[in-house]
UniProtKB/Swiss-Prot annotation:
It comes from Saccharomyces cerevisiae (strain ATCC 204508 / S288c) (Baker's yeast). It is found in: Cytoplasm; Nucleus; Mitochondrion. This is WW domain-containing protein WWM1. It holds the Pfam family WW. Present with 6020 molecules/cell in log phase SD medium. Residues 80-116 have a biased composition (Low complexity). The modification Phosphoserine is found at residue 75. One of its GO terms (cellular component) is nucleus. The lineage of its organism: Eukaryota, Fungi, Dikarya, Ascomycota, Saccharomycotina. There is a cross-link at residues 50, 60 (Glycyl lysine isopeptide (Lys-Gly) (interchain with G-Cter in ubiquitin)). Its main location: cytoplasm. It comes from the Eukaryota. Residues 32-116 are annotated as: Disordered.
Length: 211
């Protein structure tokens, strides 16, 4: 407990009271032995401090604070005040949102897709039949050759017959029955040219696509 420096204690003879500023208390020195101690020696008295004790001042201050404080509200008055305050304030009602029945979530049905048709079998590839034009060409050439040979033989026979008539019959005038010699009566030239002779037969038969 802190002690006051202005109120020194009264010690017996042979003792001295010294105030310690660091600890704010008194310690006592024995003058005969020059030793010090914190405990007061026997016979030490303390003078009465000036002014009223601290407890009286505290009671007065607490009484003054109690007089100045506002009167407490009773338990009956508090609900009335609150009821009046509630009556003055307008009441706002928030409309409740209608609750709709919850239906189970519908599951969408997706039809299964039909399986993809199997790939159509590939058509077998058949090579085109060899054209018979070449064969027909050979046949035509052969037929042309035969016709040419026949015409040549026929023309030669008629030419020989004409020479025989010209040499042995005597008359200068040559009678042409079927006009085999052409219009100009060209003799051998007309016979070979009109009938085709060997030229036409060989040209058609051997100059074609056979070789």
């Amino acid at each position: 407990m802190a002690q006051s420096k202005s109120n020194p204690p009264q010690v017996p003879s042979g003792w001295k009271a010294v105030f310690d500023d660091e600890y704010q208390t008194w310690y006592y020195v024995d003058l005969s032995t020059n030793s010090s101690q914190w405990e007061p020696p026997r016979g030490t008295t303390w003078p009465r401090p000036k002014g009223p004790p601290p407890g009286v001042n505290n009671e007065k201050s607490s009484r003054q604070q109690a007089d100045q404080a506002p009167p407490p509200y009773s338990s009956q008055s508090t609900p009335q005040v609150q009821a009046g305050a509630q009556a003055q304030q307008p009441r706002y009602y928030q409309p409740q949102q209608p609750q709709y029945p919850q239906y189970p979530q519908q599951q969408r049905y997706y039809p299964q897709q039909a399986p993809m048709p199997a790939a159509a079998p590939q058509q077998a590839y058949y090579g085109t039949a060899p054209s018979t034009s070449k064969g027909s060409g050979h046949g035509g050439a052969m037929m042309g050759g035969l016709l040419g040979v026949g015409a040549g033989l026929l023309g030669g026979a008629m030419l020989e017959h004409a020479f025989d008539d010209h040499n042995y019959d005597g008359p200068d005038t040559v009678v042409v029955e079927n006009n085999y010699y052409g219009d100009d009566a060209g003799g051998s030239d007309g016979g070979f040219d009109d009938a085709g002779g060997f030229d036409g037969g060989f040209d058609d038969g051997f100059d074609g696509s056979d070789f």
